[in-house]
Amino acid sequence: MPQEFPAIRLVALDLDGTLLNREGHVTPRTRAALQAAVDKGVYIVPATGRPLASLPPEVAQLPGIRYVITCNGAAVWDLGSDPVGAVYSRYSNAKEHRTSTPVCLLHSLMPVETAREAFAVCESCHADLRIFSDGYACTDA
């Protein structure tokens, strides 16, 4: 007898090259597939190396988007019932976006000593270093 699998409850999708095409947009075909999944009760969760502030509005506007995994998995956000307003109320002074506030459900912080060691290694190799803090990416200019 064939093995029965549980119903899919969540689909996590990387942004660049997966959810977004080469031009940085969601295709109509992808949008239709996401809508079909949402109609079956599946959570669609963007997962990205980007900080929350860099989530494209087009992604936040997709049907069924409520949760987002950011910073390469270091933070999980609940955007509530108004994802666009949640993301942009946090990072914008525009009054029209102040409809809700994102809630950080989980964040994994690097110990300070480990961060210092990583910074020293990157500096010695002249490597780019990005630090994510409070939903923003910080770089040494």
Q: Where in the sequence are the language-model features?
A:
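Asp-based phosphoryl-transfer active-site loop
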Residues: 9-23, 118
